[in-house]
Amino acid sequence: MTTTRRNKRNNKLYKNIKAIKLSIASNDTILNWSEGEVTKAETINYKSLKPEPGGLFDEAIFGPVKDYECACGKFKKIKYRGVRCDRCGVWVTESIVRRERMGHIALVSPVAHIWMSKELPSPSKISLVLNISYKEVEQVLYFVNYIVLDTGKIKDDKIMPFKFKEVLDLTGKGSLSTRQKMRRVIGYIFRNLIKSKSSEDYRKGKIFYESLKNSSLPFSLNDAFNYIKKYTGFRVGIGAEAILELLNKIDLNLEFSRLNDALRKAKKDSVEDAKVKKILRQLETISWFRNSKLHPKNMILHTVPVIPPDIRPIIQLDGAKFTTSDINNFYRRVIIRNDRLRRILEDGTVPSIVVNNEKRLLQESVDALFDNSSRHKPSLSKDKRSLKSLTDRLKGKQGLFRHNLLGKRVDYSGRSVIVVGPELKMYEVGIPALMILKLFKPFIIHGLINKFDENGNEIRPIAASIRQAEDMIKNQDDLIWGIVYDVIKDRPVLLNRAPTLHRLGIQAFEPRIVDGKAIRLHPLVTTAFNADFDGDQMAVHVPLSENAVNEARAVLLASKHILGLKDGRPIVTPTQDMVLGNYYLTTERKGQLGEGIIFSTVYEARAAYESQKVHLHAIVGISTKAFPNKKFACQGTLITTVGKIIFNDVLGNNVPYINDGEFDENACPEKFIVKQGEDVRQSILKHQIIPAFSKKVISKLIDLLYLLLEFKDLPKTLDNIKALGFKYSTFSSTTVSVFDIPKYTNKQNYFDSADQQVLKYKQFYNKGLLTDDERYKRVVKLWNNVKEKVSDEIQNLIKQEQYRDNSIVVMADSGARCNISNFTQLFGMRGLMSKSFNYERNNQSKIIKDTIEVPIKHSFFEGLTINEYFNSSYGARKGMTDTAMKTAKSGYMTRKLVDATHELIINHDDCGTRKGIVVEAIVETKTKSLIESLFDRIVNRYSITPIVDPETQKTIVEANSLITTQLAKQICATSIKEVLVRSVIYCERENGICQYCFGIDLSTGKLVELGTAVGVIAAQSIGEPGTQLTMRTFHTGGVSTENNLAQGFERLKQIFEVVTPKDFEKAVISEVKGTVKSITTVQNAQEVVIKSNVDERIYTIPFSAQIRVHVGDQVSPGSKITEGSVDIKQLLRIAGIQRVRQYMIVEIQKVYRIQGIDIADKYVEIIIRQLTNLLQVTDAGNSNLFVGQLVHSHYLNELNKSLLLAGKMPVIAINQVFGIDEAASKSNSFLSAASFQDTKKILTDAAVKNQVDYLLGLKENVIIGGKIPAGTGFLTDEELTFLGSKTVAEEY
């Protein structure tokens, strides 16, 4: 007989998932998921290789192995779909259901879920709910000790000393005490409760009484407990059954009230107190269970779900061998042990100790299945490898989240070495013909077999079949190329260079077919990719869908990425050959061929140069009317060179004539123009030579071009500058020769003098006048000074007139290659070399000796001695390892930053906030040097209140208005020292940020668009330059000065991870507002007294610390009294969250700007928003929250508004600061947090909470395979198509 049913599989794509809920599955739920019970441990039949019925791969449970074919072969083909075979019981359907259908194993004895019973380092959920320690729960579950389930009828503590839920230690140190208690109870029973002394029970009681006295005598504990139970009703239990009974008895409401009362009696203010912490943890877990309406008994399993077989496959290898997923081994063990326990229990004659042992083995086998790695002794394979359980499949870099869901291998991709493509346009890339034929193969085949043209007319196809088309492609038939060109014309490709540190690491290009096997890359985009042509490889990806193609063109095309993200400066600046060519082109020289000629048109000047009547560098005149589209301060004859006329000719309209490096953005200055009636030739003779355009000038010019030109014209102009550079660097005939190096001979005198000084230091040390540390510091300083003198002299030498046209000097001067340090090493001296040093170790010396004190005196030109070469190799290797370390650490930090901020997306125009941050110039207080100007901090942001000139009372910027470059300059020209601006920190959008709080998008120079993923951009902008930061930690002599603190990467890590600074680098800060009354020296320390309006505070400071205040100075809470790093958590306690945020912004900017890296404040603020937006409840008021709970500031504000409007008591909470690790883990999305770190803990907490993930961030949507709610995810398909076609129309 056959039966039919509707196929349970829903073929609809899960595109409209709005949210995902995670909760603890009850036993009923597991049975509901299941398609049948797995009763056998077998997998497949070794002869037929078919799944065994009732086994782990049973087709009746999990579905057919072959599409629409039952196991016995009675029903085949799609026409029987939905039919169940009456012989083998298999539903006839698609085999893909074997990836979806689940089974179950019905357990004979309940077991605890290991996630709920073992959660180190924090207590497990079971121990928190039952209020017994984690260790005791473990002892009960693994049949080591019994737990009291019922204290019975006797309520007198003297007779019945056992407490409810007390774990009876019968194996450890407390066993003697437990035995004594049991003796007391048994003694009472046989003396007082048994009337007949001759009865069997009296005799038994006496035996138990004696046995408990002498631990060497064997007796059955179970019998003893049954004896006590018979007369008193006292009951104990062991294993998961006992825990289940206790969980069934729990009253969550009663428990919640009890914990709240306990919290009120405890020290409520001190959340750090151990007792309070324990109560808060319990309260949190009980609250989660109460609010989720889940019963704690679900933490104990009666059935184990069996995951679909195709997720744990058996794979056939060569030579009739098989390999299987580790999970199958775990399931087999569970089934075998479960069956054995069933037989034992059915027998009924087996001693309880053996039964308990079998139950323990079953518990352990289920533990191993769920989480093998967290067990004391994980299950191992034959080769002693720890087997991968279900938890291991989820967590880590190779786990499901990071390996399969967030990062997948991509089809339609290729990779090859890159070479320069100077002939390409900015949006083009040269792809080898072989690669094109592979990547675009399906599209080319479609074109070859297509029977209709683009107008719908029937045509004769080039190939008759797909096979023929494939052969034509394989043989590279001449007929295919027309189709190939048509295909690539419609399809851009994405180029990616690893490591992708920021979004410019992936850009789109229009492909062009090139010969060879290397990808040809446009030279201007190399900076964005951080690529060079020394063997770098790049990957190519093909966007397949129409929307993907449109998105690639509309958003990712390389010609759209002119500005860098972190600072808004052009990232497509010409380099090397291009710089050199433009430098040569714009060079001026007196006495050149054709000097003094006056031209009336640009064409005339070009013709004269091409017919060799005038030299490129000759100073000539040209009428300003020759440039009708360029602005001049006045009309007349412009004094310039033919090279500059050619250079300006490619810059396009609306750009003023560029005649020197100090150009004006409005018009060419009057000083270069000879007015009518004045002697032009005389002016040419008097003309001062203007330096040629170096790399800095060209970079500044690109800034100007970005402001003046329309966006669509800019890439073309940049291409023109590139083409000029390559052309004229060829014409310049610049060569490099060892004989170009200038001769420098003066260094020996410095060396002789320094050698004598080193000898003196050694003598002083031998006499005990200097310590070894002092001698070392002086020697290193001496040789550094010598190198500086040599370097200065070389710098002066190469500036001499005789080296004006020297090829190497020209390269350095133009910025094309090399700098003064290279020259010093090339023909001066190499100087001191660094050596490896463990900065973390505690060494006896108080200074870091990471420099070899013997310098390399020879230059590369002279050649190094063997000793010098050997010494220099230390530094070279240290450089390589440091770079590798920095790259890894920086990459990890970027990942953490992205995880903490990815949910921040621009999703509104104006949140209407009235709060902002006060910004002022960041100045190094000790040296008074400027780190970040007020202009840099306010430009491209929105004001909150009107900004008024204090002198004239004139409003410069209206309230809620953009501070443009022009307005920022006006503000800085007044006496205004601080400005209140809008900030992402105080944006009132709950999920995301509004446009006005963020301000201008630095990559476009316009108001940030809706859908911009500013969180990820901020993380990339801060993480990407991380590799450029120094790794060195300076601490000299234990003295804490500004220079001796953790710097560079280590300091950044200290701030982002909110690490308490070490004692020697920690700054003492004032707790009060007041005046420094006195600074005195007391025994072994200094005392600073600060007088406030209320009292006086005395701060005792060791001599090793450097005091930065003086008597009479005004201080406020949080002001530094000594130099050093402030403990952020201490600052929060003393001065509040606002001060903490300001301090963190300033300190992060210091780290980057000292290294010469500019990052916009707004990116730093985004990170700080995520680190400081949680509060801890101190008084729950009339809300459902509990004391100690962490809540988001936006949620709290809304909750308090509703409470106050209802006339109820609001919630009181204090701000908290978390490091980026914790910030990422405390995300509202459990999918995002679980894919970051602590996967097991986050999923356990989410399941207990019955948590709903509303998929608001980027990662959650990538995980479920949906569109991210950012970028073009905000656009309709029609808008995207329009943007894509508009970009094609703008291509030049």
UniProtKB/Swiss-Prot annotation:
Biological process terms from the Gene Ontology for this record are: DNA-templated transcription
Q: Which Pfam families match?
A: RNA_pol_Rpb1_1, RNA_pol_Rpb1_2, RNA_pol_Rpb1_3, RNA_pol_Rpb1_4, RNA_pol_Rpb1_5
Recorded source organism is Mycoplasma genitalium (strain ATCC 33530 / DSM 19775 / NCTC 10195 / G37)
Say yes or no: keyword Transcription present: yes
Catalysis performed (reactions):
RNA(n) + a ribonucleoside 5'-triphosphate = RNA(n+1) + diphosphate
This chain belongs to which protein, by name? DNA-directed RNA polymerase subunit beta'
Assembly and interaction partners: The RNAP catalytic core consists of 2 alpha, 1 beta, 1 beta' and 1 omega subunit. When a sigma factor is associated with the core the holoenzyme is formed, which can initiate transcription.
Free-text disruption phenotype from the record: Probably essential, it was not disrupted in a global transposon mutagenesis study.
Q: Where does Mg(2+) bind?
A: D532, D534, D536
UniProt xrefs under PANTHER family = DNA-DIRECTED RNA POLYMERASE (PTHR19376), DNA-DIRECTED RNA POLYMERASE SUBUNIT BETA (PTHR19376:SF54)
Identify its protein family.
Belongs to the RNA polymerase beta' chain family.
The entry's function note states: DNA-dependent RNA polymerase catalyzes the transcription of DNA into RNA using the four ribonucleoside triphosphates as substrates.
Which cofactor names does the annotation list? Mg(2+); Zn(2+)
Example of a GO MF term: magnesium ion binding
- Say which domain of life the source belongs to: Bacteria
Q: How is the cofactor bound?
A: Binds 1 Mg(2+) ion per subunit.
